[in-house]
Amino acid sequence: MANLYMYFWEKIKVWRKEVGDFMNLHDFVHGVDPTIKLVIEDEFPGTRCVGGKYVPSTHSIFLYEKDIKIQCRHLFGSNECLESYQWIILAHELGHALDEDLLSLSAKFDQTEDIGLLYQIECNAWEIGKKLIPFINSELFSFIKDESLAHYHKEMDKIS
């Protein structure tokens, strides 16, 4: 995993020299893995507020702009850190896309419905994602990650 991190960090440094400090999300995803498709839509088609999702069957990441704004406002009371929040959501979804264990963990979950497996899937995505965006404030990243994982902690506490 350390080699993967160093590989991506070196790519990020090169990209930042080429495009300055601003990098768009599509270019970033393409630089990480050109086989991943990024789709940015206005809002999630269901009733839940979903900022992003990864679809393994199409190797696609979907980001939902309105939902990301709603989540950011809900967590922080404003959209002051919206750009960083969007990068964090993208990095998390990239974490799913790059997780070599995702398919096997998902298959095990389908068989067992063990919430611990879902928690592991999410933790893997957060761990991988964090390494992709060292230019984002680490305390902000940790806060968002912890908020995201809180639901799983509550569910696992009910079981034990």
Where are these regions (language model features)?
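Active-site recognition of the HExxH zinc-binding catalytic motif
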Residues: 85-102
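Post-HEXXH active-site segment of zinc metalloproteases
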Residues: 100-127
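Glycine-rich, flexible loop segments associated with nucleotide phosphate handling
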Residues: 77-90, 114-120
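Active-site scaffold of zinc-dependent metalloenzymes
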Residues: 40-84
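Hydrophobic (often cysteine-bearing) scaffold residues that line and stabilize catalytic clefts
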Residues: 21, 87, 121, 125
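A metal-dependent hydrolase signature that marks the N-terminal structural subdomain at the beginning
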Residues: 1-59
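Short, flexible/disordered intra-domain loops and linkers
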Residues: 13-15, 72-80, 109-114
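Long, well-structured alpha-helical subdomains associated
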Residues: 6-14, 80-84, 118, 127-160
